[in-house]
């Protein structure tokens, strides 16, 4: 243990140029490189976690707006609900109109409901 402490003291006393020379000598003697593997870390970060694109969406009726009757008609057409069920859904907003639908179908439903006067969001 005393030898290690003595070695640490001697290494601490080296100048920067002497430390660089020591590094080169050790690299040659042991056949290694003191360069940091930066490229490997960058590649690992890129392959870490691919972002998955969402494939299923929920269409949420946030607010029916001023034209409730038009929104109720659209909800009935989209969901095949009866008049009372569609009315309850619209008046109980925010509620899901359709769940787990494709991106295209969700966008189509959102467009129809917004044209009828509703506020809609996709989740």
From Swiss-Prot:
Coiled coil: none annotated. InterPro entries: Ribosomal_bL12, Ribosomal_bL12_C, Ribosomal_bL12_C/ClpS-like, Ribosomal_bL12_oligo, Ribosomal_bL12_oligo_N_sf. Keywords: Ribonucleoprotein, Ribosomal protein. It comes from the Bacteria. The keyword Nucleotidyltransferase does not apply. One of its GO terms (biological process) is translation. Belongs to the bacterial ribosomal protein bL12 family. Forms part of the ribosomal stalk which helps the ribosome interact with GTP-bound translation factors. Is thus essential for accurate translation. This is Large ribosomal subunit protein bL12. The lineage of its organism: Bacteria, Pseudomonadati, Pseudomonadota, Alphaproteobacteria, Rhodospirillales. The gene is rplL.
């Amino acid at each position: 243990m005393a030898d290690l402490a003595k070695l640490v003291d001697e290494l601490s006393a080296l100048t920067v140029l002497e430390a660089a020379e020591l590094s080169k000598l050790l690299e040659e003697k042991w056949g290694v490189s003191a360069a940091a593997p930066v490229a490997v870390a960058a590649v690992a970060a890129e392959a870490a976690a691919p972002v998955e694109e969402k494939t299923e969406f929920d269409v949420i009726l946030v607010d029916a707006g001023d034209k409730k009757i038009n929104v109720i008609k659209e909800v009935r057409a989209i969901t095949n609900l009866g008049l009372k069920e569609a009315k309850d859904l619209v008046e109980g907003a925010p509620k899901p109109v359709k769940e787990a639908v494709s991106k295209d179908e969700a966008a189509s439903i959102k467009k129809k409901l917004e044209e009828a006067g509703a506020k809609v969001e996709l989740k």
